[in-house]
A protein has these predicted regions:
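Conserved ATP-binding TGD loop and adjacent catalytic N/P-domain core of P-type ATPases
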Residues: 401, 427, 433-575, 583
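Bilayer-spanning, highly hydrophobic alpha-helical transmembrane segments
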Residues: 16, 232-262, 277-295, 574-603
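P-type ATPase nucleotide-binding
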Residues: 339-465, 474, 486-502
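Juxtamembrane coupling segments of multi-pass membrane pumps/enzymes
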Residues: 65-66, 91-151, 182, 309, ...
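Membrane-embedded transport module
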Residues: 247, 508, 547, 552-625
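Transmembrane helix-loop-helix hairpins at the membrane interface
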Residues: 2-124, 226, 235, 242, ...
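Conserved cytosolic catalytic loops of P-type ATPases
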Residues: 116-209, 313-356, 398-399
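Conserved catalytic phosphorylation-site environment of P-type ATPases
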Residues: 63-71, 173, 273, 283-359, ...
């Protein structure tokens, strides 16, 4: 509990004790009045002070004003009627403060969920000076510096491992508990926790530009983007509160005046009491507090799951998503070429890969890199001579004095070598040794492990259509789309063509359209869609800048989880709106008719607020979605 919350709690206890003393010992007269007024001032002083300040500043119509008018009015009515019953006035303030304390604690719990993410902020960086480790502020570490991260410490800046190996805990960033390995040459990002070995890292970004700073900035700014529901409640409260004050005044004055005109007793006490009850019931705090809290909790729950949403307006839009468009590479596929097959080989597969990897050793093309990875052995460039790259065809070279040709079917035709066609989907690399065909290698962009499951999960989450856009050839695109059960596929697209396809889908879509990309070269499409989702954004500034929703790892299943989180949050928001307005509307009518008394008004105010707040913090629970 905060210091302020403890103070309110002590005021609640003191007031409850004073009221209990008065009731238990049946203290009446002046002593009873003094004790009731003391209890009222103890519990209500803070509210009265806020109401007075609001009047001075011209901000009259808020919940403090309503509570002050209602309770002071109830005391005045008790004095006027000489009943000596000040219990209702004290009870209104007491239960209102209990409700306020409860919602303050709930907001604090929700805020702690978000600020738990702030634990990724590193407090220091270790640098070596004169053979000793010195702790410095991460802001003071220049790009290109060597920092040392010991087991149990957070990585303070993005960089590349130059020495050492370890496992990294990325749970605070991705929501996943599975550690990741890091060794020399691997890129690492700030915010991860080093678990086992000592790492030396050469920094590649200043602290202000590092991943941890970008994420914290995004989270801290998320509350500034209000949803339509929040804006509606804000506007509603500005109109609603003055309206009910006027309504209460009319209820207190008009019926007695009408009765006097009719020659009857004005019965002022009854109608003023009803008006005061009307004021207590009408307090809009259940809506004003629970709706923003629902979104705040939803954003916090999403953050814990590794889904960063830039504002509640995007959370609301995400909940209405009916069409999801994917960029293939890096989203549904891993975006890394791998050797998947070797066919028609006239020598052992390992030897085929060795010849191909050696012939391609001088090339930096992704296909060359994939051949070298598949071979896995040491590349001795001294074994390779007479390398000739034939543009658009492939490479010829001598490996250990043997003529080797590696390339596409055009290279085989050019050299007059008969080759075998391949029905596998992917890039086909043919190999010839001393003019004789030696087989071909199939290289493919591998589908992500959970991609098919992710498409099915989107359907279960209520997404009506899934679309895949790619610059790849039609045969490859159709194969991937068929394997994943994607509804619609468009291939051989340039970046401008992808924007055009999204424009067309937007015009046809019944509901909101989300575009999912890796955030690196998808900025135009991410910004054009109703909601842009960037995947695998750890370390990608472009993704964090361009997207509305950032998934911190490469798991496509997080997309459906993000949609389910948003829908749960909006469902809670609508439940609270309907519940609060329904109960208050009913009690307002009953209060005006004299059926609902001040105790019913207390439930309609504090009880409804507590129930709505309890419902709101359910948005934090996202583990089972």
């Amino acid at each position: 509990m905060t210091k302020k919350q403890k103070k309110v709690l002590w005021c609640i206890i003191a007031t409850a004790v004073l009221v209990a003393v008065v009731k238990l010992f049946s203290i009446g007269g002046v002593a009873g009045t003094v004790l009731y007024l003391a209890a009222y001032l103890i519990i209500g002083y803070d509210i009265l002070r806020k109401a007075f300040r609001g009047i001075i500043k011209g901000q009259v119509f808020d919940e403090n004003f309503l509570m002050a008018v209602a309770t002071v009015g109830a005391i005045a009515l008790a004095v006027y009627e000489r009943s000596g019953d000040y219990l209702e006035a004290v009870a209104v303030m007491l239960f209102y403060q209990i409700g306020e304390l409860f919602q303050s604690y709930a907001v604090g719990k929700s805020r702690r969920s978000i600020t738990a993410l702030m634990d990724i902020r590193p407090d220091y960086a270790n640098i070596e000076q004169d053979g000793k480790l010195v702790q410095v502020d991460p802001d003071d570490v220049a790009v290109g510096s060597i920092i040392v991260v010991q087991p149990g410490e957070k990585i303070p800046l993005d960089g590349v491992v130059t020495e050492g190996s370890s496992t990294l805990n990325t749970a605070a960033l991705t929501g996943e508990s599975l550690p990741r390995d890091a060794a020399a040459g691997d890129e690492v990002i700030s915010g991860c926790v080093n678990m086992t070995g000592v790492l030396k890292i050469r920094t590649t970004k200043a602290f202000g530009e590092s991943t941890v700073s970008k994420i914290l900035e995004l989270v801290e700014n998320s509350s500034s983007h209000k949803s339509r529901s929040e804006n509606f409640i804000s506007k509603f409260a500005r109109i609603y509160t003055p309206a009910v004050c006027i309504g209460a005044l009319v209820l207190a004055v008009l019926p007695p005046v009408v009765r006097l005109v009719m020659g009857l007793s004005g019965d002022w006490g009854t109608w003023v009491y009803r008006a005061l009850t009307f004021l207590v019931i009408s307090c809009p705090c259940a809506l004003v507090i629970s709706i923003p809290l629902s979104f705040f909790a939803g954003l916090g729950g999403a953050s814990r799951a590794g889904v960063l949403v830039k504002g509640s307006n995007y959370l609301e839009t995400l909940s209405k998503t009916r069409v999801v468009v994917f960029d293939k590479t890096g989203t549904l596929t891993q975006g890394v070429f791998d050797v998947t097959d070797v066919h028609h080989n006239t020598m052992p597969q390992k030897k085929v890969l060795e010849y191909a990897a050696l012939a391609e050793c001088a090339s930096s093309h992704p296909i060359s890199k994939s051949l070298q990875r598949a071979y896995g052995g040491e590349i001795d460039r001294h074994r390779v001579t007479d390398v000739q790259e034939i543009s658009g065809n492939g490479i010829t070279a001598k490996v250990d004095g043997t003529d080797v040709a590696v390339g596409n079917s055009k290279l085989m035709d050019r050299l007059g070598i008969a080759w075998h066609d391949c029905h596998s989907v992917g890039t086909i690399i043919h190999l010839a040794i001393d003019g004789q065909y030696a087989g071909h290698i199939v290289i493919s962009d591998v589908v992500k492990p959970h991609a098919k499951e992710a498409i099915a999960a989107l359907k279960q989450a209520g997404v009506e259509k899934t679309v895949m856009l790619t610059g790849d050839i039609r045969r490859v695109a159709d194969h991937v789309a068929g394997e994943l059960c994607v509804d619609e596929v468009h291939s051989e697209l340039l970046p401008a063509d992808k924007v055009a396809q999204v424009e067309r889908l937007l015009s046809d879509a019944d509901g909101k359209l989300a575009f999912v990309g890796d955030g690196i070269n998808d900025a135009p499409v991410l910004s054009r869609a109703d909601i842009g989702i960037a995947m695998g954004a750890m370390g990608s500034d472009a993704a964090i800048e361009a997207a509305d929703v950032v998934l911190m790892d490469d798991d496509p299943l997080k997309i459906s989880k993000a949609i389910r989180i948003s829908r749960k949050c909006l469902r809670i928001v609508y439940e609270n709106i309907v519940f609060a307005l329904g109960i208050k509307g009913l009690c307002l009518v009953l209060g005006a008719m004299g059926i609902a008394n001040m105790w019913a008004a207390i439930f309609a105010d504090v009880g409804v607020m507590v129930i709505a707040v309890l419902n709101a913090i359910r948005a934090l629970r996202v583990d089972n979605l």
